[in-house]
Amino acid sequence: MEYGKYYLIIRKIAQLVFPKYKAPQFEPTDKPVVYVSHHQNMFGPVNVLLWYPTFRRLWGLSVFIDQQACYDHYVNYTFTQRFKLPPFIAKPLAWGVSYFVSRLAQSARVIPVYRRSRQIIRTLKESVETLQAGASVLIFPDIDYASDDSEVGRIYEGFLNLEKYYNRKTGEHIDFVPLYAKQTTKEILYGQTIRFDKDRDFIDQRDEKAHELQAELNRLANTEVEVDLV
C-alpha cells in the first residue's frame, strides 16, 4: 500500500509553503512499528506527514473520511462551537472543506477511528492488518489535542490495546516508537522504543507504558539531541 496521487500532489504543494523539517533518514527498526506523536493543535500531524519520507498510516477520526459525516462535524462542532462562526458562514465553508478533507484522508490511507463505539474493533483489525502487511501506523493520542503546548499532557490509553490484539493474532509484540516534531530546531526526532513485557499481564502495564510514552515525548520536547535506539 502507498499514498494516493491526490494526497501526494497536495503534500508537494504544501511543502512549498511550510518550513522544511529535517526527518530521520533511517527507520528505527527493520519491522513495522506504531509511531506515537504529539498533536499540538495540528502542528504535529502537519509536519510529520509533510516531511516524513516513508509511508505510514495515520489514525484519524472516522468523521473525516466520509464527506457527509465530515460536513456535519464541521457545521455542528468545529466551525460553530469551536470557532464561533454563524451558521450562514459555517455551512457553505463546511461544504467545501468537507469535500477536500475527506478526499485527502482517503488518499492518505487514513485508518478510521470510531470513538466510543464497538466499531473500534475495526480500527484495531485494520491496524494489525497494516502492520502485518509491512507498513507502520502513526497515532496522535493527546486528550487535549487543541493545546499549543510543546509538552504532551494526558494521553488516551485505548490505542495500546493494539498490543493485545496484535499479540493475539501474531504471537509477537509491537514496538511503540515516540516521534516528535520539534519546532525550535525544525527536526523530527525518534525517542526510545517502548515495548510491553512479555512476562507480565497486558492490563497490569498499560497505564505504565502510556506514562513512559508521554515522558519520552516530553523528553524529546526538551532536548536538542536525538537518542540512540534500542
Model region roles, listed by residue range:
Residues 1-3:
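Short glycine- and acidic-rich boundary segments immediately preceding or forming the N-terminal edge
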Residues 115-230:
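Non-catalytic C-terminal accessory region of glycerolipid acyltransferases
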Residues 31-115:
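Catalytic core of membrane glycerolipid acyltransferases/transacylases, capturing the structured
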Residues 26-31, 52, 130-133:
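Flexible, charged surface loops at secondary-structure boundaries
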Residues 19-24, 44-45, 124-125:
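A generic local structural motif
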Residues 5-32:
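A short, well-structured juxtamembrane/interface segment
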Residues 16, 107-108, 133-134:
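Structured helix-beta-strand junction loops
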